[in-house]
Swiss-Prot record:
InterPro entries: Vps51. Residues 1-51, 133-159 are annotated as: Disordered. GO terms for biological process: Golgi to vacuole transport; protein transport; retrograde transport, endosome to Golgi. Coiled coil: none annotated. Involved in retrograde transport from early and late endosomes to late Golgi, leading to the membrane fusion between late Golgi and endosomal vesicles. This is Vacuolar protein sorting-associated protein 51. Residues 138-159 have a biased composition (Polar residues). It is found in: Cytoplasm; Nucleus; Golgi apparatus, trans-Golgi network membrane; Endosome membrane. Component of the Golgi-associated retrograde protein (GARP) complex. The modification Phosphoserine is found at S18, S21. It is a peripheral membrane protein.
Length: 159
């Protein structure tokens, strides 16, 4: 991979450069110059129009009404802000999918490892169980504990 590509990836993910001594990674992404959204626009995107929550919301009517009211500059600005939001959500979505997939693979590997080791651990568990003293009744108390008497490798059997 060329050094320009590596640098572009480092810039995109806010990773420290190869000559950087810092080991911290920033969690905020710098927007690209073509899709820059001002903080004012970002706060405007955070405010959701209550009309969107209406069960009878008609997206076509909303867009038509907005297009009639807005100037071409406002339309372009809204387009830029929506594209930037969609790209940000897309990056977040890919990140979530990758992270969860990675955790799923790790959990699957752990379960497979446990299942492979289970057959060797069951006889040792049975030996440890047999070595334990059995509970007995004390002082004629009627509160008794009925402990299983043996372990046959897969399940405990009652007395």
């Amino acid at each position: 991979m060329s050094s320009k590509r590596r640098q572009a990836l480092r810039d995109f993910y806010n990773l420290p450069g190869s000559n950087s001594s810092s080991s911290t990674v920033s969690t905020t992404r710098k927007p690209s110059s073509s899709n820059t959204v001002s903080p004012v626009e970002e706060t405007a995107l955070d405010k959701v129009d209550p009309e969107f929550s209406d069960p009878n919301f008609d997206s076509n009517a909303y867009v038509s009404k907005f297009m009639e009211k807005a100037t071409p500059a406002e339309l372009l600005q809204r387009d830029k802000s929506l594209v930037a939001s969609i790209q940000g959500l897309s990056v977040d979505h890919r990140s979530l999918v990758y992270n969860h997939y990675k955790h799923l693979l790790e959990a699957s590997d752990a379960i497979n490892s446990f299942c492979k080791n289970l057959n060797t651990l069951l006889p040792a568990l049975n030996d440890a169980y047999q070595a334990c003293p059995k509970p007995t009744r004390k002082n004629g108390n009627n509160d008794t504990y009925s402990a299983p008497q043996s372990f046959n490798g897969n399940e405990f059997s009652a007395p």
